[in-house]
Design a protein with these regions (language model features):
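Nucleotide/phosphate-binding catalytic cleft detector across ATP-hydrolyzing
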Residues: 1-16, 20-208, 225-227, 236, ...
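Glycine-rich beta-strand-to-loop/alpha-helix junction loops that act as flexible
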Residues: 79-84, 321-331
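Short glycine/threonine-rich loop-to-helix capping motif typified by GTGT followed
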Residues: 198-200, 328-342
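A general structural motif
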Residues: 211, 298-307
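A structural feature that tracks compact, well-ordered secondary-structure segments
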Residues: 217-219
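A cytosolic small-molecule/anion-sensing beta-strand core signal
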Residues: 222
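Hydrophobic, well-ordered secondary-structure elements that form the walls
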Residues: 306, 325, 373
Length: 404
C-alpha cells in the first residue's frame, strides 16, 4: 500500500495522547483503522507544550505503539492543537471573476479564500485555519457551491482561527523531535466535530463539546458550515483535583475514584452506596453521592462557561441539533443528563462516523479527535488531487464542500 493511502492522526492532549493509523484505497468509501496507540502526556499544560523533550517522549511513545500495531515504519501525521491561546475572528475575501465568460473557476475560489487570509494575524499569533462559511455571487448570498456559476464578483465569508505563535512553534518542535513529519495542524475540537457530526446535524445547527483533561473545545455548526469555535479553560482533570482536596487522597486515587465511582448527577446517586477510601490511600468511608456532588459542581461550571459562550454569539437554546458530547472527559456517567439540564438542549454522546475500525476505538470518545484528524487528512488528500494548483491546497481547508 502506498504511503499516500496511509495517514496518522495524532491528538496531543494535556493528560493523554492518542494516535490512530488508518488506510484508504480508491475503492473504499471510508478510512479503515489499522493501528492505534495511547500514552500518558508529559510536558503539557492547558493544551500547550511547556517541556519540549518531555512532550516529545510521550508523543513518540503513542506514535510508536500505533505504527507497530499497524505494521508500518512511518507515515505523515495530522496533528491536533488544543490550547495555546485560540482566537477566532470573521474575515472576508472579494475577487473579480477572471474568465471572460464570467464562469467561476476553482482558481477564483482559491483567490477568494486567499484574499480572506490577506488580513494579517494579530501580533504573536499565527493563522491556523481559514474556513469558508458562506459564498456570495453578485450580491446573491447563501450560496454553498459557487463553482461553475456565472457572475462578476465572488465573495466569501470565512472564520479565521488563530493560535499563539509560540504554542504552535513549540508543538512543531516536540513532534519533530519525536521523529514525526507533520502533514497538517488542526484545532483539536474541530477535528473531533469532523468525526462525530453527520451532515444533517451540521445543517440543523449543532454544538460539539470536546471535553479533555484541562480544556474543553467548543464548536458550533449551522447551515452546514462552521459558525463558531472556542477553547474553554476547564476540563475533566479539574474534577479530579477537586476530589483530591475534597476527599484528601492523592491524584492517582482521585482519578481512579472518578472513573470507577464518579457520576455527573448527584441527585440520581444513592446515599446508601459507600466507597472505602482506605483501599485507595484515604482514611475513611464516604458516600458515593459525595463524589457525584463534587464532580457535578465542576462539570456544571464547564457547561456554564459553554452557555455563556453560546449567549455571547447569540446561539443559546437556538440549536435544533442540540449538543454532542465527546472527548475522554465525557465518559463520566450521567454527564448527558447534567448537560441537558444546564444547557437546555437535547444531548447526544458523540462517536466517530465516516470511519471504520474496532469498536473499542471508533466508539471511544477519547479517540474522537484522533479519528477526526485521519478523516480530515484523507479529505485534504482528495482536495489536493482535485485542485488545479495543488500547491494552494493547504489554504483551502474544507473545499470538499465546494468541489464535487
Amino acid at each position: 500500500m502506498s504511503r499516500e493511502n496511509i495517514i496518522i492522526g495524532l491528538d496531543v492532549g494535556t493528560t493523554s495522547i492518542q494516535a490512530v493509523v488508518a488506510s484508504k484505497s480508491k475503492t473504499q468509501e471510508a478510512p479503515q483503522v489499522i493501528g492505534w496507540g495511547e500514552a500518558v502526556s508529559r510536558g503539557m499544560r492547558k493544551g500547550a507544550v511547556v517541556d519540549i523533550e518531555e512532550a516529545a517522549a510521550a508523543i513518540r511513545e503513542a506514535f510508536q505503539k500505533a505504527i507497530n500495531h499497524a505494521g508500518i515504519k512511518n507515515a505523515e501525521a495530522v496533528v491536533s492543537i488544543g490550547g495555546g491561546n485560540i482566537f477566532v475572528r470573521p474575515s472576508k475575501g472579494v475577487v473579480i471573476v477572471s474568465r471572460a465568460d464570467r464562469e467561476i473557476s476553482r482558481e477564483d475560489i482559491q483567490r477568494a479564500l486567499l484574499q480572506a487570509e490577506a488580513i494579517p494575524a494579530s501580533p504573536n499569533r499565527e493563522i491556523l485555519h481559514n474556513l469558508a462559511r458562506e459564498w456570495t455571487v453578485d450580491g446573491e448570498k447563501g450560496i454553498k457551491d459557487p463553482l461553475g456559476m456565472t457572475g462578476v464578483k465572488l465573495e466569501v465569508d470565512t472564520l479565521v482561527i488563530e493560535c499563539g505563535a509560540s504554542a504552535l512553534k513549540n508543538l512543531r518542535k516536540a513532534v519533530s523531535l519525536a521523529g514525526i513529519k507533520i502533514r497538517e495542524l488542526v484545532l483539536s475540537p474541530l477535528a473531533a466535530s469532523y468525526a462525530v457530526l453527520n451532515p444533517r446535524q451540521k445543517e440543523l445547527g449543532t454544538l460539539v463539546l470536546d471535553i479533555g483533561g484541562s480544556t474543553t473545545g467548543l464548536v458550533i455548526f449551522e447551515e452546514g458550515d462552521i459558525f463558531h469555535a472556542a477553547v474553554l479553560g476547564l476540563g475533566s482533570s479539574h474534577a479530579t483535583h477537586d476530589l483530591v482536596y475534597g476527599l484528601q487522597v492523592d491524584v492517582d486515587a482521585a482519578e481512579k475514584i472518578k472513573k470507577t465511582h464518579g457520576s455527573a448527577l448527584a441527585e440520581s446517586t444513592s446515599s446508601r452506596d459507600m466507597i472505602d477510601l482506605k483501599k485507595l490511600g484515604g482514611e475513611n468511608t464516604i458516600q458515593r453521592k459525595e463524589v457525584a456532588t463534587i464532580c457535578e459542581a465542576r462539570f456544571s461550571e464547564i457547561f456554564d462557561m459553554a452557555q455563556k459562550e453560546l449567549k455571547r454569539v447569540g446561539r443559546a437554546s437556538m440549536l435544533p441539533g442540540g449538543a454532542v458530547l465527546t472527548g475522554g472527559g465525557s465518559r463520566i456517567p450521567r454527564l448527558d443528563k447534567l448537560a441537558k439540564k444546564d444547557l437546555s438542549l437535547p444531548i447526544t454522546r458523540g462517536v466517530a462516523q465516516r470511519i471504520s475500525g474496532p469498536e473499542e476505538i471508533v466508539q471511544d470518545p477519547a479517540f474522537s479527535a484522533a479519528l477526526g484528524l485521519v478523516i480530515w487528512g484523507f479529505d485534504e488528500t482528495f482536495n489536493r488531487a482535485t485542485m488545479e494548483n495543488p500547491s494552494e491546497s493547504k489554504f483551502v481547508g474544507w473545499l470538499k464542500n465546494f468541489i464535487p
